Each structure stands twice: as C-alpha cells, then as structure tokens.
Amino acid sequence: MPAVEKIGDNLRLRIFLQPKASKDHLIGLYDNALKISITAPPIDGQANAHLLKFLSKTFKVAKSQIILEKGELSRHKQILIPHPKSIPPVVANLLIETT
C-alpha cells in the first residue's frame, strides 16, 4: 500500500509517527510511510490525540471526522481523512507519485 492513497474524496495515510519531537511537522516519505513528528509524548494516548489535532489543522477537517484505522499503540498508523479541504505539498507530491 502506498503512503498516501486517494479513495474517492477521502485520503488514507500510512504514517510513521515520531513522538516527543521539537516541533509538529510533516517530514516526508520514510520506509513507505509518511513520517510525521509531533511534540506530544507517547503516554496514555497523548500522542494519538495530538496527531489527530495536528492532522485536523493541516487538512482543515474536523478532528472528530478523522479515523485512526490501525496502530493505536504503534508508531505505524493508518488514518482515513474524509473530504480534506487542504492538502499540504508534501502529501500532494506523494499522492502524485503513487497514481
């Protein structure tokens, strides 16, 4: 499966998460996944909550609409973003490469 996949009007992302980073940032392709760094620690779901908040702002979608499909307790995650209003250049480039 590619790192970024368009399914109708939705996006499915395979993510490699780096918690406890110095800033929130979309890094790019890493090991066939989109690498994202976030500042939250991986304790009691803080990293997942922070990731969803970051993706919500980045893709301009309500946080409650973003679905964590796989990887709740892992650095490797699969996330579905319904009807993104904005697609960052890093993600758009990966989307173009996979189609």
Swiss-Prot record:
InterPro entries: DUF167 (IPR003746), YggU-like_sf (IPR036591). One of its GO terms (cellular component) is cytoplasm. It comes from the Bacteria. Coiled coil: none annotated. Belongs to the UPF0235 family. NCBIfam families: DUF167 family protein, PRK05090.1. This is UPF0235 protein HSM_1819. It comes from Histophilus somni (strain 2336).
